[in-house]
């Protein structure tokens, strides 16, 4: 089965899950507890993160969701009478609603986590079969965002067929994005929106729509069951791969996979390459920078996953980049940046180690963002040639003219005015680093 999209792919005319007040129209911005603390969470850590989002200026930049991930409930089971999930009284002595009150008082929103199975990934009670009860609980507690995972699925509710997700988390090899050893592929024309996986997620969607509160719905089915085909009608974002880790190899692999899904991203629905690892692990500063820039240009949800009360200034600077956040949240243009040249590889090569290196995307202000990545492990030169950038090649000087095409260019990282750049912009990049250019008017 071939998963790889082609260069001729057009925008997908999928039905979108449109919510009131613009909720989910642009990609989510926020913070989540998992990459920072895993299961070691409590009310104090969540409220501290919320306060830091305000104190560090992140709220002013648009970050708004403070999301509680797995391990927030009593692990032994539900209330035997009401069947409701019980918040852990040791971790959350005032319940989830108590945390919601504090988060809302800061002008922020609160998110929570469950799974479309019997248990969560950490073994806590999940929502399969209790969708309406849990949606009502979430609404009553003041929840604004639900991350819905794919763990704890009973064997009688697994899919009849297997969809090809070319991701290393299952240990297989995927030559150029294909699943050569897939033995139970769906027949041609099969509608994955009717699959058991899709129905599990649709049940929670319907439950959330039935309550008197707008809750952003973030699907986390790891790309299974061709979620790209039905995710936009079901949720506001959908995971397209297995979990991220704080390693460059994994970040590059996910960026490569997601680069072939950009035609699915637009207002109200976004493929999700997982939460940010900026500030975590042993990532170099260039790798942190490249990670954030790629996610922002792909218009992925930008969900911070590091302890904010101890964040390094250099990492905060990356997360606070105004030009990239402005591109990411453009209220007029919903499409993300697209790769226009692979650089290290021939175009349209599926390579987990070397994702597409040249990206561009338009803005409502008329500027064009151009990203150049050095996917190699040593210093390399990269060049943005204006005639190769789709949004620029038809502007200005005619192709047959001897005069070189020039544009006003600004460095998105430093804010430095690079002046009138003729023909191309060339830069030396450290291993796994990026340059992001804001290309303005002709000069």
Swiss-Prot record:
A Pfam short name: Melibiase_C
Q: Please report any disulfide bonds recorded for this protein chain, giving both cysteine positions.
A: 39-71, 121-151
Q: Which GO terms describe its cellular component?
A: extracellular region
Q: Which residues are glycosylated?
A: 79, 156, 176, 181, 212, 232, 282
Annotated active site: 149, 243
Annotated GO MF terms: alpha-galactosidase activity
Q: Signal peptide span per the entry?
A: 1-20
Catalysed transformations (reactions): Hydrolysis of terminal, non-reducing alpha-D-galactose residues in alpha-D-galactosides, including galactose oligosaccharides, galactomannans and galactolipids
Keyword presence, Transferase: no
UniProt GO BP: carbohydrate metabolic process
InterPro entries for the chain? Aldolase_TIM, Glyco_hydro_27, Glyco_hydro_27/36_CS, Glyco_hydro_b, Glycoside_hydrolase_SF, Melibiase_C
- For this UniProt record, give its keywords in alphabetical order, as a comma-separated list: Disulfide bond, Glycoprotein, Glycosidase, Hydrolase, Secreted, Signal
Positions contributing to substrate binding: 221-225
Q: What is its EC number?
A: 3.2.1.22
Compartments in which it is found: Secreted
Q: Which family does it belong to?
A: Belongs to the glycosyl hydrolase 27 family.
Function in brief:
Hydrolyzes a variety of simple alpha-D-galactoside as well as more complex molecules such as oligosaccharides and polysaccharides.
- What is the protein name for this chain? Probable alpha-galactosidase B
State the species of origin: Aspergillus niger (strain ATCC MYA-4892 / CBS 513.88 / FGSC A1513)
Q: Which gene encodes it?
A: aglB
